[in-house]
Amino acid sequence: MKTKLITRAGYNKLKQELDYLWKEQRPEITQKVSWAASLGDRSENADYTYNKRLLRQIDRRVRFLSKLLPELKIVDYSPQQEGKVFFGAWVEIENEAGEVKKFRIVGPEEIYGDAKDYISIDSPMARALLKKQVDEEFQVHTPTGIKEWFINSIEYEKGEL
């Protein structure tokens, strides 16, 4: 089961997407569908077929976001989080081979598009990191075995209010 937590920035991004789809893109595509339908024969009308398909995709995403947003719980930064890994943290870790990774722990709904440096709170890596501190070692169970990592830094975005 997916965790229904989200950062304020992630929530705002999803809300902006919903507003854009509903208030701008959907009316524009609806107008194109109406125009294409007015041309007559719809069976061989590529504009009509394409825009009708696009309208269905928009409607599907609007329904998904409209149902999802009220279910999400926004987690804001709290000063008590400083020094430990919690939801919303940017964490830099390193393994014995010197491989360094930096990512942010977020809700599963925030991981889409260009969010390649985000990991889900539900992932094994995030679960292993929770409540750990800088300079602490931790283990992650992976399909190829247990991996050991070291925490270099923990940061929070404090301006997300």
From Swiss-Prot:
It comes from the Bacteria. One of its GO terms (molecular function) is DNA binding. Coiled coil: none annotated. The keyword Nucleotide-binding does not apply. Keywords: DNA-binding, Transcription, Transcription regulation. SUPFAM superfamilies: FKBP-like, GreA transcript cleavage protein, N-terminal domain. GO terms for biological process: DNA-templated transcription elongation; regulation of DNA-templated transcription elongation. The keyword Transcription applies. Pfam families: GreA_GreB, GreA_GreB_N. HAMAP family: GreA_GreB (MF_00105), GreB (MF_00930). Necessary for efficient RNA polymerase transcription elongation past template-encoded arresting sites. The arresting sites in DNA have the property of trapping a certain fraction of elongating RNA polymerases that pass through, resulting in locked ternary complexes. Cleavage of the nascent transcript by cleavage factors such as GreA or GreB allows the resumption of elongation from the new 3'terminus. GreB releases sequences of up to 9 nucleotides in length. This is Transcription elongation factor GreB. It comes from Vibrio cholerae serotype O1 (strain ATCC 39315 / El Tor Inaba N16961). The gene is greB.
